[in-house]
């Protein structure tokens, strides 16, 4: 029984923290003079809290694992909602496909170059050979 309460508390805490970051992102988004979705700002707030270790990752991990496990199910309402605009989507199908292909290619380039740079830096940091004297 006690274990059940602990697990429920962990899930409740995780979802509350994720939701508080979303609310903070929405509040910041409403104050900005330009448009950035509040959910994006909320994710950045959550990332900042986790990266600076202000918020322990263990506190949000149960909720994140549950959301990731059921992520495909969460996209069903979006897919159904897009079908309300089938005429518009079918008219703009070409530009949508082109933008998806171009953005995919750009992401692949950025990831490739970033990986090469990180591997190069890791190889230099891992090189523990003493410097050679030029005599």
From Swiss-Prot:
Its main location: membrane. The chain crosses the membrane at residues 5-25, 30-50, 63-83, 93-113. The keyword Cell membrane applies. Pfam families: LrgA. The keyword Signal does not apply. GO terms for cellular component: plasma membrane. It is a multi-pass membrane protein. Keywords: Cell inner membrane, Cell membrane, Membrane, Transmembrane, Transmembrane helix. It is found in: Cell inner membrane. Belongs to the UPF0299 family. This is UPF0299 membrane protein PC1_1498. It comes from Pectobacterium carotovorum subsp. carotovorum (strain PC1).
């Amino acid at each position: 029984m006690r274990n059940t309460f602990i697990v429920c508390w962990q899930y409740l805490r995780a979802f509350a923290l994720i939701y508080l970051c979303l609310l903070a992102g929405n509040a910041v988004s409403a104050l900005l003079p330009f448009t950035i979705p509040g959910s994006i700002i909320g994710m950045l707030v959550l990332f900042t809290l986790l990266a600076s270790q202000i918020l322990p990752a263990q506190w949000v991990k149960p909720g994140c694992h549950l959301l990731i496990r059921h992520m495909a199910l969460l996209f069903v309402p979006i897919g159904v909602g897009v079908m309300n605009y089938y005429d518009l989507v079918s008219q703009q199908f070409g530009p949508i496909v082109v933008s998806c292909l171009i953005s995919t290619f750009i992401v692949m380039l950025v990831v490739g170059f970033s990986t090469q740079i990180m591997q190069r830096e890791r190889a230099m940091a891992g090189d523990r050979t003493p410097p050679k004297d030029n005599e």
